UniProtKB/Swiss-Prot annotation:
Keyword Cell cycle attached: no
Keywords: Phosphoprotein
Taxonomic source organism: Homo sapiens (Human)
Protein name: Neuronal tyrosine-phosphorylated phosphoinositide-3-kinase adapter 1
Segments of skewed composition (Low complexity): 26-39
Residue numbers spanned by region Involved in CYFIP1- and NCKAP1-binding: 76-186
Compositional bias ranges of the Acidic residues kind: 252-261
Compositionally biased intervals (Gly residues): 94-103, 224-243
Family listed: Belongs to the NYAP family.
Region feature Disordered, mapped onto this chain: 1-45, 64-448, 655-679, 745-769, 812-833
C-alpha cells in the first residue's frame, strides 16, 4: 500500500507539473482568456486532488486500477476517478478538454475495451456473438452471411448435442438439444425431426442424423424414461414405433443393459420374464427363486408394483422406481444387504425372515421357509429376537463379529445341515421351544461334524440370548432335544432354560468331544457375543446375562440376574449357567465328566455344561473361542487353560456342579449334582476348588466360592468369586440353592473347604436332594445376602474397590487379586458392579 501510495503521489505530481505547463502555455497563448484559463488550471488541480483523495479514501480499492490505467489511457486528473467509475472513456471525453492527447488516449482505450467485450462474449456465449458482432464488426457479414453463421453456430451447437448422443444415459443433454435448437430457427428443420424422433421415438426416419439421434435418444429414453423396457411395454413401443433399424439395435443394447439391471432390480422371475423377452429374465427367475424365500414379501411386492408401473406407467415414472428397485433387489441377491430388510420385515414373517438368511447363505435351501419344518418354526419364532444376527456374526467372528449381518455368518455355515441349524439361530430361532424342537434334528449332524456343533452352539447361543426370558419355555423342549444321554437331556433342558439352543451343541459335542468342544467353545463365544450385542456390555457380560436371565426368570429373579451376569461378564459369565454360549460346552463336560462340570462349573455352569469333550480340551477351546469373544475371551482364556488343568483334577469330584437354571437346573442337577440354580454354584471336588485356588484362577476362585458365593453374590465377592458371586446373587434370586448351601461358609471358609463339600453335593444333588438343598440354600442365601450387603456397604465405603474398577475391568481385577486376595477382602462392590452393569446394560 505504501508503494502504491508513493507511486500514485509521484504520478500525481507529474500530472500537476504537466497541468501547470499546459495552463502556462494556454495562458501565454490566449491573453484574452488568461482569466478563464487561470481559473481552469486551478479547477483541474482541485479536481485531481479531490480524485486522488477519493481514491485513497476508497481504501486503495481503486488505486491499483488507477495505476494500471492512468499512465496508459490518460494522465489527466480524471484518470483515478474514471478508472474507479469504470468509465474512463466517458470521463476522459468529458474532461478531455485539458489536452487533446488525453482525448486520443481515451479513444484508444475505448476502442480496446469494446472489442474486448465482444471477444469475451463469443468465447462464453454463442448467442451473444451474433448481436455483439453485428453491432460491432460486420453488419455486412451479419446480413450477407447470416445463413453461414447460423450454420456455423448449428455445427458448433450440434457438436455438443453429439456428446449427449454419445452418452445415452443423459436425458438433460437430449432435452438441452431440444430446447437449444428451438432458439436458432436455422436448425429448425432438423430439430423437428430430432424432436419427433426423440419425443415420440417413432419419427426418426427423415434424416440419417435424425435416426442416429433417435437411436441414441431412444437408448437414453429407454434407460431413463423407458426403464419400463424391463417392464417390456416401453421396450415394445419404441422398437415397433421406432422405424429406424439403428434405434432398434440401440434398444436391444439398452435392453440388454437394462436386463442386467432388471435382474438386479426385479427378483420376481415371472414379472421379469414377462417384462423382457430377452435371456436376462431367466437369470432373474433363477436368482429370485433363491431369494424369493429370503425376501418374498418385499421383493415380490416391490417388483410387482414396480413392474406394473414400469410397464403400464409412463417411462419417467418407471425410471425413478426402477432405480430404487434394483437396489432392494440387489440387497436380496446379496446376503449382506439382505440383513437389514430381512431382519425387520421379512424375518418377521415366520418363514421368510429365517429363510432369507438360509437362502442367502445357501440357495440350495431357497425354501428357507421350507428347508426344514424345524427351521421355519424356529425362524418364525426367532425373527423377533435381534440377537440372531450377532449369533451369526459370532459364528464367524465371535463377539467382534456381532455387527456382521446374517449374510456374513451364513457363508461360514458352509455345510447344508449346519446352515439349516444356523439358519434357525440366524433367523433368531430364539424361542427356546421351537429352537429346542428344531435343534433336535440338527444335533446329530452337529455331533457328526465338529464344525456344525459350533454352528449349533452359535445358533443356539443366539437362541439362548434371544430367549433370555423364554428359556423357561425352552427348558421343557430342551430335554427332548437332548435325545442323547438323560444327563444330556437334563442339561440340555437346563441349558435351554439358560441358552435354549446352547444345550444342543453339548449333545453334538458329546458325540465328538473335540469337535463338540470346539463347537461349544465357538458357541460360548458366540453366545457371549450375542448376549453382548443385546446388552451393550462386553460379550462376556452378554453371555452370562443371557443365562442369568434364564434362571432368574425361572426363579423370578430376572431383573437382578442380568446385572449379576453383567458383573460376571468379567468372571461370572463362564461361571453361571447364565453363560449361555459356554454352557453348551460346560454342559458337555458336566454330562460326560461330572468332574469336568464341577471343576469347570467354577468357571461357569454354561462352560461345564457346554464342554462335553475332555474338560481340558473343551475348556481350552472355550478359552480360544472366548479369545474372539473379548472379555469373555480374556476370562475364558485365563480360565480355559487353568480350568482345563483343574478340570482334570476336579473331574473326579467336579460332577457336583451347582450351576444350572433353577427350573432346568433341577433336571440337570441330577446330572451335574449340586447344580441347583442356573447360577454356576460349582460344587466342585475339593481338588477342583483347591486347584483353582492354587491356580489363582478367577474361574478357580469362582468354582470354590461360587457355590456359596454365587447364591450370595456379596459373599462370593468377598470370597473368591467375583463373577460367580454375582451369579450366585442372581442365582439366589433365581433359586440357586445349591450355591447357597455352600455359599455362606465358602465366603468365610477357604475354597478348599468349599470344594470338598461340593464333591459330596454333586453326588447327593440328585433331583430329590436338590429341593432340600435349595431350601437350605435359601436360608443360607438370606444369611449370605446379609453378609454380602454388609460387605457391599463396606466396599462402597471403600473407593478402591469401587464400582468403577469392577465395571471397567471386572475380569482383570479378579486376575490381579487372585482368588485368595478376594477371599481376604472380597469386595462387596461386586454387587454394586452388578447394579452398575445393569444400568450400563
Amino acid at each position: 500500500m505504501n508503494l502504491l501510495y508513493r507511486k500514485t503521489k509521484l504520478e500525481w505530481r507529474q500530472h500537476k507539473e504537466e497541468e501547470a505547463k499546459r495552463s502556462s502555455s494556454k495562458e501565454v497563448a490566449p491573453a484574452g482568456s488568461a482569466g478563464p484559463a487561470a481559473g481552469q488550471g486551478p479547477g483541474v488541480r482541485v479536481r485531481d486532488i479531490a480524485s486522488l483523495r477519493r481514491s485513497l479514501r476508497m481504501g486503495f480499492m481503486t488505486m491499483p486500477a488507477s495505476q494500471e490505467h492512468t499512465p496508459h489511457p490518460c494522465r489527466s486528473a480524471m484518470a483515478p476517478r474514471s478508472l474507479s467509475c469504470h468509465s474512463v472513456g466517458s470521463m476522459d471525453s468529458v474532461g478531455g478538454g485539458p489536452g487533446g492527447a488525453s482525448g486520443g488516449l481515451t479513444e484508444d482505450s475505448s476502442t480496446r475495451r469494446p472489442p474486448a467485450k465482444p471477444r469475451r462474449h463469443p468465447s462464453t456465449k454463442l448467442s451473444m456473438v451474433g448481436p455483439g458482432s453485428g453491432a460491432e464488426t460486420p453488419p455486412s457479414k451479419k446480413a450477407g452471411s447470416q445463413k453461414p453463421t447460423p450454420e456455423g453456430r448449428e455445427s458448433s451447437r450440434k457438436v455438443p448435442p453429439q456428446k449427449p448422443r454419445r452418452s445415452p444415459n443423459t436425458q438433460l443433454s437430449v432435452s438441452f438439444d431440444e430446447s437449444c435448437p428451438p432458439g436458432p430457427s436455422p436448425r429448425g428443420g432438423n430439430l423437428p425431426l430430432q424432436r419427433l424422433t426423440r419425443g415420440s421415438r417413432v419419427a426418426g426416419d427423415p434424416d440419417v442424423g435424425a435416426q442416429e439421434e433417435p437411436v441414441y435418444i431412444e437408448m437414453v429414453g429407454d434407460v431413463f424414461r423407458g426403464g419400463g423396457r424391463s417392464g417390456g411395454g416401453l421396450a415394445g413401443p419404441p422398437l415397433g414405433g421406432g422405424g429406424p433399424t439403428p434405434p432398434a439395435g440401440a434398444d436391444s443394447d439398452s435392453e440388454e443393459s437394462e436386463a442386467i439391471y432388471e435382474e438386479m432390480k426385479y427378483p420376481l422371475p415371472e414379472e421379469a420374464g414377462e417384462g423382457r423377452a430377452n435371456g436376462p429374465p431367466p437369470l432373474t427367475a433363477t436368482s429370485p427363486p433363491q431369494q424369493p424365500h429370503a425376501l418374498p414379501p418385499h421383493a415380490h411386492r416391490r417388483p410387482a408394483s414396480a413392474l406394473p408401473s414400469r410397464r403400464d406407467g409412463t417411462p419417467t415414472k418407471t425410471t425413478p422406481c426402477e432405480i430404487p428397485p434394483p437396489f432392494p433387489n440387489l440387497l436380496q441377491h446379496r446376503p449382506p444387504l439382505l440383513a437389514f430388510p430381512q431382519a425387520k420385515s421379512a424375518s418377521r414373517t415366520p418363514g421368510d425372515g429365517v429363510s432369507r438368511l438360509p437362502v442367502l447363505c445357501h440357495s440350495k435351501e431357497p425354501a428357507g421357509s421350507t428347508p426344514a419344518p424345524q427351521v421355519p418354526a424356529r425362524e418364525r419364532e426367532t425373527p423377533p429376537p435381534p440377537p440372531p444376527p450377532p449369533a451369526a456374526n459370532l459364528l464367524l467372528l465371535g463377539p467382534s463379529g456381532r455387527a456382521r449381518s446374517h449374510s456374513t455368518p451364513l457363508p461360514p455355515q458352509g455345510s447344508g445341515q449346519p446352515r439349516g441349524e444356523r439358519e434357525l439361530p440366524n433367523s433368531h430361532s430364539m424361542i427356546c421351544p421351537k429352537a429346542a424342537g428344531a435343534p433336535a434334528a440338527p444335533p446329530a449332524p452337529a455331533a457328526l461334524l465338529p464344525g456344525p456343533p459350533k454352528d449349533k452352539a452359535v445358533s443356539y447361543t443366539m437362541v439362548y440370548s434371544a430367549v433370555k426370558v423364554t428359556t423357561h419355555s425352552v427348558l421343557p423342549a430342551g430335554p427332548p432335544l437332548g435325545a442323547g444321554e438323560p444327563k444330556t437331556e437334563k442339561e440340555i433342558s437346563v441349558l435351554h432354560g439358560m441358552l435354549c439352543t446352547s444345550s444342543r451343541p453339548p449333545v453334538p459335542g458329546k458325540t465328538s468331544p473335540h469337535g463338540g468342544a470346539m463347537g461349544a467353545a465357538a458357541g460360548v463365544l458366540h453366545h457371549r457375543g450375542c448376549l453382548a450385542s443385546p446388552h451393550s456390555l462386553p460379550d462376556p457380560t452378554v453371555g452370562p446375562l443371557t443365562p442369568l436371565w434364564t434362571y432368574p426368570a425361572t426363579a423370578a429373579g430376572l431383573k437382578r440376574p442380568p446385572a449379576y451376569e453383567s458383573l460376571k461378564a468379567g468372571g461370572v459369565l463362564n461361571k453361571g449357567c447364565g453363560v449361555g454360549a459356554p454352557s453348551p460346552m460346560v454342559k458337555i463336560q458336566l454330562q460326560e465328566q461330572g468332574t469336568d462340570g464341577g471343576a469347570f462349573a467354577s468357571i461357569s455352569c454354561a462352560h461345564v455344561i457346554a464342554s462335553a469333550g475332555t474338560p481340558e480340551e473343551e475348556e481350552e477351546e472355550v478359552g480360544a473361542a472366548t479369545f474372539g469373544a473379548g472379555w469373555a475371551l480374556q476370562r475364558k482364556v485365563l480360565y480355559g487353560g487353568r480350568k482345563a488343568k483343574e478340570l482334570d483334577k476336579v473331574e473326579d469330584g467336579a460332577r457336583a456342579w451347582n450351576g444350572s437354571a433353577e427350573g432346568p437346573g433341577k433336571v440337570e442337577r441330577e446330572d451335574r449334582g449340586p447344580g441347583t440354580s442356573g447360577i454356576p454354584v460349582r460344587s466342585q471336588g475339593a481338588e477342583g476348588l483347591l486347584a483353582r485356588i492354587h491356580h489363582g484362577d478367577r474361574g478357580g476362585s469362582r468354582t470354590a466360592l461360587p457355590i456359596p458365593c454365587q447364591t450370595f453374590p456379596a459373599c462370593h465377592r468377598n470370597g473368591d468369586f467375583t463373577g460367580g458371586y454375582r451369579l450366585g446373587r442372581s442365582a439366589s434370586t433365581s433359586g440357586v440353592r445349591q450355591v447357597v448351601l455352600h455359599t455362606p461358609r465358602p465366603c468365610s471358609q477357604p475354597r478348599d473347604a468349599l470344594s470338598q463339600p461340593h464333591p459330596a453335593l454333586p453326588l447327593p444333588l440328585p433331583l430329590p436332594p436338590q429341593p432340600a438343598r435349595e431350601r437350605d440354600g435359601k436360608l443360607l442365601e438370606v444369611i449370605e445376602r446379609k453378609r454380602c450387603v454388609c460387605k457391599e456397604i463396606k466396599a462402597r465405603h471403600r473407593p478402591d474397590r469401587g464400582l468403577c474398577k469392577q465395571e471397567s475391568m471386572p475380569i482383570l481385577p479378579s486376575w490381579r487379586r487372585g482368588p485368595e486376595p478376594r477371599k481376604s477382602g472380597t469386595p462387596p462392590c461386586r454387587r454394586q458392579h452388578t447394579v452398575l452393569w445393569d444400568t450400563a446394560i
